[in-house]
Design a protein with these regions (language model features):
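Bacterial Sec-dependent N-terminal signal peptides
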Residues: 1-25
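Cell-envelope and extracellular/periplasmic
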Residues: 21-245
Length: 245
């Protein structure tokens, strides 16, 4: 009853707003990691986030009868938690703003793992591999999916990244370690497995850690403080140079 009331409130709110107001609202966007064919962690409070215009209601409805509503902040960012059931699917999730609706289809609930590391984790099944042809040909596991973060510092390529279902074509670009881990786990516990591949050869773990966190760690806080100081000095020097130009 509570979920139904939330839904009715959202619908009534939508009809009360004028079409001219709707046209001024920014498009509803989801973080790229949320796409068709994704896997969400079972029996958890899972965060879903994205952006729209500031101070706008965002309604999320999952087909396992979970409905929640939130509001974007002053910058248009929003983040909401939904409760997931035990493993299963496929399900769908609707994300609704005043202007847009995004439908996520073929969503599975299971176990989600992060595959992070350097070149060993990055190594693809399309690279040299023992029994490569046989492994690729037999890689048709509908309940194994992988999301691969592209090697791109601009943040642009990830906008087009999607979850991929394991099959003899998609698996060629999967992390080999990530795939074989997922395959073994899926065979052993018989639940959907999602792998988020964030590997990049030669990178240090600090590069994958937020500045906020690095400032709190004994091993890195002094280094970050020096970087902050250098950045401030560079900014001050730029202001002086601009003033003298």
């Amino acid at each position: 009853m509570k979920n139904l009331s939330l839904f009715l409130i959202f619908i009534l709110f939508s009809f009360q707003n004028s079409f001219s107001f709707q046209n001024s609202i920014k498009p509803l966007l989801l973080a790229p990691v949320f796409s068709d064919h994704m896997v969400l962690q079972q029996k958890s409070d899972v965060s879903i986030w994205g952006s729209t215009s500031p101070n706008q209601d965002v309604f999320v409805a999952a087909s396992w009868d979970e409905k929640v509503i939130t509001k974007s902040d002053k910058d248009g960012e929003w983040n909401i938690k939904i409760k997931t059931p035990s493993y299963g699917g496929p399900y769908n999730i609707s994300v609704i703003s005043l202007k847009d609706t995004i439908l996520l289809d073929d969503v599975l609930i299971g176990e989600v793992w992060l595959a992070s590391g350097q070149s060993n984790m990055q190594w693809k099944l399309s690279n040299r591999l023992v029994n490569q042809e046989q492994e690729i040909a037999n890689a048709n596991y509908n309940q194994i999916r992988m999301f691969t973060v592209p090697l791109d510092l601009t943040g642009e390529k990830i906008k087009n990244s999607k979850w991929k279902i394991s099959n003899s074509e998609n698996v060629k670009l999967f992390s080999a370690v990530g795939y074989f881990f997922a395959k073994r786990l899926h065979v052993d516990i018989n639940v959907p497995i999602g792998i988020i591949n964030t590997s990049w050869g030669g990178t240090r773990v600090e590069a994958w850690t937020s500045l906020k966190k690095l400032r709190t760690l004994n091993a890195t806080k002094d280094i970050i403080s020096n970087l902050d100081l250098n950045a401030d000095n560079n900014q001050n020097n730029k202001k002086v140079n601009d003033a003298n130009a």
